[in-house]
Amino acid sequence: MAMQMQLEANADTSVEEESFGPQPISRLEQCGINANDVKKLEEAGFHTVEAVAYAPKKELISIKGISEAKADKILTEAAKLVPMGFTTATEFHQRRSEIIQITTGSKELDKLLQGGIETGSITEMFGEFRTGKTQICHTLAVTCQLPIDRGGGEGKAMYIDTEGTFRPERLLAVAERYGLSGSDVLDNVAYARGFNTDHQTQLLYQASAMMVESRYALLIVDSATALYRTDYSGRGELSARQMHLARFLRMLLRLADEFGVAVVITNQVVAQVDGAAMFAADPKKPIGGNIIAHASTTRLYLRKGRGETRICKIYDSPCLPEAEAMFAINADGVGDAKD
C-alpha cells in the first residue's frame, strides 16, 4: 500500500514537472495529432504547444497542408495542455509574486522599478542618443546570467542589434564587476544583427527555436524601431509600417508569454513640429505611435543629466507610480550616480 502511494506521488510530481514551463510541440503527437502535421507546424515556426494554443485559427490554416478541420483539432488538443481559461485573482496574484526581476546594475533604478526589469513582459526604453539605452542593454545582458539571489535570471541573453552598436568589450567589463568569467558570459549571449524589418521579424522565429533548446532569461532588441524608419517612408506607407510593427511586437509578447523571458526594446524619439510642441515641456515623443505604446507593459523615458548621469522616468506602467531616478554610466556598466 505504501509502495503504491509512493508510485502515485512520483507520478504526480512527474506530471507537475512536465507541465512547468513551455512544452515541446512533439507533445501534440501523444494527443493524436499526426506526426507530419506536427512537423509542418514546426517548419512554420511553432516550436511549443503554447505557441500553437496562443495562435489564431487563420494563422494555422495559412500553413500548407493544414485544413480547417485539422486546425480545429490541433487547437482543441493544444487548449487541453495549456491553461487558458479563467482563474481567480488570488491564483494570479500568487503567480505574479513568483515573477523574477533582473537588476539593472543601479540600486536607484532597481528601486524605481520595484526590483528591476520584469520577466514575462515587454519593457520599452526611449530617449535621445547618449541617454544610456544601449548601456542598460549591455549591463542587463550580463546581470540576467547572475543567480536569482543576486538579482539575476539564471539564464542566457539574446541580443538583436539593428544599429550596429553591440560591443562585447562592454560585456567583459560588466562581467569583471560581478566576478563572472568573461568567456562564459560571452558564450551565454546569442547575438544577431538585424538588416531590415523582415529579417528582424525572421530572427524572432529563430529565437523561438533556440529558447526551446536552452534557458534564456532576456531578449533585447536595440533598436526595435530604427529599421522601420528607413524601410518605410512617408505617410503613404504609414499603414503598412504600423501593421508590420504590430506583428513584430505581437511576436515579442508571445515569446514573453511562452518562455517567461524579459523582453527589453529600445525606441527612438522624434521632435514634435505641430502647434502642441510650443506648449509642451519636452517636445520629443517616442516613435511607433499607439501600437508600440499598447504593446509595451512598462515604458521608461531616459534623458541626460549632468556629466555622466542620466535620469530615468516611469512614462507608463500598470503598477509603478510615475517617478524618476538618477543613474550613471560607468566603465563597468550602469551604476548609481555619485553625489
From Swiss-Prot:
List the Gene Ontology MF annotations in alphabetical order. ATP binding; ATP hydrolysis activity; ATP-dependent activity, acting on DNA; ATP-dependent DNA damage sensor activity; chromatin binding; DNA polymerase binding; DNA strand exchange activity; double-stranded DNA binding
Chief location: nucleus
Residues in HhH domain copies: 48-77
Q: Which residues carry this modification: N-acetylalanine?
A: 2
Q: How is it modified after translation?
A: Ubiquitinated by the SCF(FBH1) E3 ubiquitin ligase complex, regulating RAD51 subcellular location and preventing its association with DNA. Ubiquitinated by RFWD3 in response to DNA damage: ubiquitination leads to degradation by the proteasome, promoting homologous recombination. Phosphorylation of Thr-309 by CHEK1 may enhance association with chromatin at sites of DNA damage and promote DNA repair by homologous recombination. Phosphorylated at Ser-14 by PLK1, triggering phosphorylation at Thr-13 by CK2, thereby promoting interaction with TOPBP1 and recruitment to DNA damage sites during S-phase. Phosphorylation by ABL1 inhibits function.
Q: Where does ATP bind?
A: 127-134
The tissues in which it is expressed are: Expressed in the mammary gland.
Give the protein name, as stated in the record: DNA repair protein RAD51 homolog 1
UniProt source species: Canis lupus familiaris
